[in-house]
């Protein structure tokens, strides 16, 4: 039996909590890699899940939720771009999936990735339907979670090095 994935939790300078988890690719990702990342000649070795704690429940009215989701997406895009280019610099294929559209940022993809489905498949978190959307249910944060996904061909050692370097440069503090 495989051990559960290790989740590292960080606190940003503004006090936001972020969880980062490195997991093997799901069956869906493995089966659809060519559609998700058509320009890759190597296999995905790991998915990097980035879960951000939202300041509001994503079950709130859309007028409260949309500005929060935009802010969380922007934070992920900044972090994710820095991480994928650091991994690229060390020779690994890497791409992130835009949480809003589900499409890979760098690939000319015709397949979307559902972040909630990836988290459900890898971490076992529940997903519920709510007003034509699917919401992830975090075991502690409940509906206050914004998931995002990065794919890479890098080794675990290289991923850990890049994440440690990037989180340190951002002054994100690991929570014990």
Task: Locate predicted features.
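Auxiliary alpha/beta "docking" domains used to position bulky ligands
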Residues: 1-175
């Amino acid at each position: 039996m495989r051990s559960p994935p290790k989740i590292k939790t960080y606190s940003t300078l503004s006090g936001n909590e972020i969880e980062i988890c490195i997991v093997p690719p799901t069956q869906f990702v493995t089966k659809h890699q060519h559609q998700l990342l058509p320009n890759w000649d190597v296999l995905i070795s790991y998915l990097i899940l980035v879960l951000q704690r939202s300041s509001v429940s994503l079950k709130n009215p859309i007028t409260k939720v949309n500005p929060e989701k935009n802010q969380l997406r922007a934070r992920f895009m900044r972090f994710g771009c820095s991480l994928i280019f650091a991994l690229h610099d060390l020779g690994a294929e890497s791409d992130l999936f835009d949480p809003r559209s589900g499409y890979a940022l760098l690939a000319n993809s015709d397949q979307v990735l559902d972040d909630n489905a990836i988290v459900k498949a890898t971490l076992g978190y529940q997903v519920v339907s709510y007003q034509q959307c699917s919401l992830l249910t975090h075991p502690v944060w409940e509906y206050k979670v914004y998931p995002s996904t990065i794919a890479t061909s890098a080794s675990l050692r290289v991923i850990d090095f890049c994440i440690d370097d990037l989180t340190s440069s951002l002054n994100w503090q690991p929570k014990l």
